[in-house]
């Protein structure tokens, strides 16, 4: 049963990320959808922080949705700013996840940063969400 659930989850994720890729590569991409996925990253990180208001405030400051929107909707790709945003996001994941996953998270970061510019946003969204899924799985095992 566990194997079937895993296969269903993998198929769902593949279809979902294929839709993201198709959307981003379309003539008129739905940027609101991508922005919502970025906001979801922020919300998921905040959900892991229950009481520490200082950390919650730092996450809120680091995840500037308007800045992200500007980055992805601008016709001129700002690789330096995007790199900072990607690194900041993965730094938060590394702070909040179990240390056993640090190597795989850093590999995901490298994958994103080494992506070609036209694919970097979709790969970033996918890889961060996969890291957050791992944190969720770890937390479920603890309860």
Predicted regions and their residues:
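Extended helix-rich, non-globular scaffold segments
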Residues: 58-143
């Amino acid at each position: 049963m566990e194997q079937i659930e895993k296969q269903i989850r993998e198929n769902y994720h593949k279809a979902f990320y294929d839709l993201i890729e198709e959307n981003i590569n379309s003539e008129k991409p739905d940027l609101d959808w991508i922005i919502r996925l970025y906001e979801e990253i922020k919300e998921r990180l905040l959900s892991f922080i229950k009481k520490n208001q200082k950390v919650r405030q730092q996450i809120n400051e680091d995840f500037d949705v308007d800045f992200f929107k500007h980055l992805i909707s601008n016709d001129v790709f700002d690789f330096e700013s995007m790199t900072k945003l990607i690194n900041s996001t993965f730094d938060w994941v590394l702070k909040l996840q179990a240390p056993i996953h640090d190597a795989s998270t850093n590999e995901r970061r490298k994958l994103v940063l080494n992506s070609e510019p036209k694919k970097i946003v979709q790969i970033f969204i996918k890889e961060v969400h996969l890291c957050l899924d791992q944190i969720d799985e770890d937390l479920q095992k603890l309860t």
